[in-house]
Swiss-Prot record:
Full protein name: Bifunctional protein FolD
Pfam family, one: THF_DHG_CYH
NCBIfam families: PRK10792.1, PRK14186.1
Family, per entry: Belongs to the tetrahydrofolate dehydrogenase/cyclohydrolase family.
Length: 288
């Protein structure tokens, strides 16, 4: 069996086009365009690339994009003060603080300072809690983007045995909640998991997010499984690969996401979706 490729790049472009049309309709109706504030502290090269892609997406869909590039020496108090200012700004619907933050700044404190109705990354405890309680509003971008991919490919998730490799706050944990909502029987594995191969071999839907190139051999994949590879790893030769050995896995799976061009584009597209949602549901006069 040769797997069908889940083309995240194309689906992400569809999502962005849909958002752009809604923004045009808003502006034509006399409503303001959604606003996103992107905050970058320091000069981490990977972070700069991610931030640039988010700003480009904002411009493409017609958002008002505000950039705050702060020096590495920025104190936690200064960053919190900026967030307070943005929380109070009625033209800003979403606040994104690019992680990781420099040493000496508490990630948790910063993320909790963002108003839940402007938390378009979906990391605030309020939004994570709503997801856990089956009443999601602003949902973490990568897990929600993966659900969108499955939906757009008309993949029926109800009753599937889903296995999530990796238990991070950004992907693994919220992904497990999304999969429960999608009707899966869900297992989350982590560094203390015994016999990882056993879990992988029984997965109808496998989502891998550990950040280790080729971590899951293709021979472990169940025949006909759906494989979602969240990993983005750059090898010494410059090649970008996922956490799954792609060619081997693609020979056994029914569907698989490539790296690059799979999950990555969906994370940014979902951020854009979340910002529009925050604008409509929380900040429009009729949404309150």
């Amino acid at each position: 069996m040769a797997a069908k490729i889940i083309d995240g790049k194309t689906i992400a472009q569809q999502v962005r086009s849909e958002v752009a049309q809604k923004v045009q309709a808003r502006v034509a109706a006399g409503l303001r365009a959604p606003g996103l504030a992107v905050v970058l502290v320091g000069s981490n090269p990977a972070s700069q690339i991610y931030v640039a892609s988010k700003r480009k997406a904002c411009d493409e869909v017609g958002f008002v994009s505000r950039s705050y590039d702060l020096p590495e020496t920025t104190s936690e108090a200064e960053l919190l003060a900026l967030i307070d200012t943005l929380n109070a700004d009625n033209t800003i619907d979403g606040i994104l603080v690019q992680l990781p933050l420099p040493a000496g700044i508490d990630n948790v404190k910063v993320l909790e300072r963002i108003a839940p109705d402007k938390d378009v990354d979906g990391f605030h405890p309020y939004n994570v809690g709503r997801l856990c309680q089956r009443a999601p509003r602003l949902r973490p971008c990568t897990p929600r983007g993966i659900v969108t991919l499955l939906e757009r490919y008309n993949i029926d998730t109800y009753g599937l045995n889903a296995v999530v490799i990796g238990a991070s706050n950004i992907v693994g944990r919220p992904m497990s909640m999304e999969l429960l909502l999608a009707g899966c029987t869900t297992t989350v594995t982590h560094r203390f998991t015994k016999d990882l191969r056993h879990h992988v071999e029984h997965a109808d839907l496998l989502i891998v997010a550990v950040g280790k190139p080729g971590f899951i051999p293709g021979e472990w994949i169940k025949e006909g499984a759906i494989v979602i590879d969240v990993g983005i790893n750059r090898l010494e030769n410059g090649k970008v690969v996922g956490d799954v050995v792609f060619d081997e896995a693609a020979a056994r799976a029914s569907y698989i996401t490539p790296v690059p061009g799979g999950v990555g584009p969906m994370t940014v597209a979902t951020l854009i979706e979340n910002t529009l949602q925050a604008c409509i549901e929380y900040h429009d006069p009729q949404g309150k």
